[in-house]
């Protein structure tokens, strides 16, 4: 029944609003659980992750101790992510490094859950079905989960992008929007640039979309907002070390090569979310998945609300195909545009089916397909457990602890202790090989980079204890370097993980440490 003004009763409106947010909360909860459980089953909250996540957290901790990236240590990305992690690193000074890192990881999982809810919100004007499928698709989409499970660059960059889309949405239907909202949207795009330089690709696509819908003044305001925020965050670091910052963020990234998935097919496979499949399959499956995504793009294009996501999916996807390096989390760059496009396409497909019974059948079939895809998470794990007994050796180390993976310093709660003791700090040991190769103008692998081999040995040997987990068996350290490391007393071993006591040839072992293991 309507009131005299033609509006539904207040209690009906309240119930609708409650149901409205219930869907968002449910989608976010599913997304959070999907991100948390594989980590708990795998390495656990204190485990070893992707290497990169430890690099960014270690960099944030160094900033909390007064060090500056580019000037005091190498960082191959803009400073946005370490700055975002600095509050967790500061809080860790009152607890422990591992606790701060765990809190940061959980925060990223929560951001992933928020991202899923934002996708639902963005697609809501298209229809409830599109919003539901879009949000749930992101919740279980392998590239999204992989990137949101820890402190990787793609997670906060996705959040910034989705809020940008939401803020600019009124422009689609010639609606009015305040200048400050447009400026904030631009600033958020600028934030993506300060997190990863790939944000420039996102900015260009957003500007092209605004020009296509003839929002010229909005495009200018977005450009100004993005430039302003990027300048505020990056210029202080650039002023201190301009050459080093340029070389590390731009030159080294353009010059570097490496990672798996070097073929177009491998990359398309990851972008389409087929990484969830734990067994081999014919290339025809990948081709079919890509064709399905292009079909979704064609369907979604009929909605003006979905055109920016479609452009982002195609533009960012094309960029991923040509970038010189590739790692699994790179597919997270397109995760949100892909699921937004899929959600809008499903909404359009169901709308094309006129008969209500047929719509129900199509919805059930698509829901079943999504459920089958999500079932792939039943046995997936992320990360590796770190041997707790290694802390016996690091806790009693009289000097510094060195490592080939900064995550081990976090796991043993020696990162902040090292920094307080004035130990030599290296957030990204492997990244130095890219910097050295680019500076020399040589395309040389890490194993054959003699300058890096000397650099790594010099650093690892500067500690009283060294934890080696990343480059065993010739994967990063060549035979000569490995032979030197093997001469150091072995304190503990767990699988390929080792704790060694660096000593020079002919020098005695450092007293006060637990007795080395017999080999």
Predicted regions and their residues:
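Perimembrane helix-loop-helix junctions
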Residues: 7, 171-174, 202-228
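Short acidic/glycine- and proline-prone juxtamembrane loop motifs at membrane-interface regions
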Residues: 146-156
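Hydrophobic, aromatic-rich transmembrane alpha-helices
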Residues: 277-310, 314-317
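Short periplasmic/luminal acceptor-recognition loop of GT-C membrane glycosyltransferases, typified by
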Residues: 76, 380-383, 391-449, 453-477, ...
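Membrane-interface transmembrane helices that cradle and orient dolichyl/undecaprenyl
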Residues: 124-129, 162-184, 294-305, 346
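Membrane-interface alpha helices of multi-pass inner-membrane proteins
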Residues: 135, 162, 179-197, 202-209, ...
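Transmembrane-helix motifs of polytopic, lipid-linked glycan transferases
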Residues: 106-126, 163, 295
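Transmembrane-helix signature of polytopic, membrane-embedded enzymes
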Residues: 116-140, 159, 305-311
């Amino acid at each position: 029944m309507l009131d005299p003004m033609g509006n539904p009763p207040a209690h009906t409106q309240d119930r609708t609003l409650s149901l409205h947010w219930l869907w968002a909360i449910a989608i976010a909860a599913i997304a959070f659980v999907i991100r948390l459980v594989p980590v708990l089953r795998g390495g656990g909250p204190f485990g070893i992750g992707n290497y990169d996540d430890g690099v960014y957290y270690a960099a944030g901790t160094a900033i909390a101790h007064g060090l500056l990236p580019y000037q005091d240590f190498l960082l191959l990305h803009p400073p946005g992510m370490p700055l975002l992690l600095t509050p967790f690193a500061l809080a860790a000074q009152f607890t422990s490094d591992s606790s701060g890192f765990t809190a940061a990881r959980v925060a990223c999982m929560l951001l992933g859950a928020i991202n899923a809810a934002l996708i639902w919100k963005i697609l809501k004007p298209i229809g409830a079905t599109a919003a539901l499928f879009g949000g749930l698709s992101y919740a279980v989409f392998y590239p999204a989960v992989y990137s949101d499970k820890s402190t990787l660059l793609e997670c906060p960059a996705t959040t910034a992008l989705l809020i940008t889309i939401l803020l600019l949405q009124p422009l689609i239907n010639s609606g009015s929007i305040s200048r400050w909202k447009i400026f904030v949207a631009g600033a958020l795009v600028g934030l993506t640039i300060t997190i990863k330089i790939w944000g420039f690709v996102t900015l260009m696509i957003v500007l092209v979309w605004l020009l296509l819908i003839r929002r010229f003044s909005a495009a200018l305001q977005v450009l100004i907002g993005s430039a302003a925020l990027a300048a505020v965050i990056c210029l202080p670091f650039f002023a201190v070390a301009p050459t080093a910052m340029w070389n590390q963020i731009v030159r080294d990234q353009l010059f570097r090569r490496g990672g798996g998935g070097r073929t177009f097919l491998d990359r398309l496979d990851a972008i389409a979310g087929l990484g969830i499949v734990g067994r081999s399959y014919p290339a025809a499956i990948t081709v079919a998945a890509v064709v399905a995504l292009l079909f979704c793009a064609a369907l979604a294009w009929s909605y003006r609300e979905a055109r920016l996501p479609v452009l982002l999916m195609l533009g960012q996807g094309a960029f991923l195909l040509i970038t010189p390096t590739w790692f699994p989390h790179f597919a997270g760059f397109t995760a949100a545009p892909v699921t937004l496009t899929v959600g809008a396409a499903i909404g359009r497909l169901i709308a094309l089916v006129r008969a209500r019974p047929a719509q129900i059948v199509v919805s059930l079939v698509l829901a079943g397909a999504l459920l089958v895809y999500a079932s792939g998470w039943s046995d997936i794990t992320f990360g590796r457990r770190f041997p707790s007994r290694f802390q016996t050796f690091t806790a009693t180390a009289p000097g510094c602890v060195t490592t080939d993976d900064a995550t081990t310093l976090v796991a043993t709660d020696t990162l902040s202790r090292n920094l307080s003791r004035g130990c030599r700090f290296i957030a990204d040991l492997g990244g130095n090989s890219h910097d050295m190769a680019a500076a020399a103008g040589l395309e040389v692998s890490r194993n054959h980079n003699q300058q890096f081999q000397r650099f790594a040995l010099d650093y690892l040997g500067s500690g009283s204890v060294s934890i080696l987990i990343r480059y065993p068996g010739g994967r990063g350290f060549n035979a000569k370097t490995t032979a030197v490391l093997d001469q150091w007393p072995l304190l503990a071993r767990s699988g390929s993980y080792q704790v060694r006591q660096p000593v020079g040839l002919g020098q005695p072992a450092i007293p006060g440490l637990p007795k080395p293991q017999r080999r």
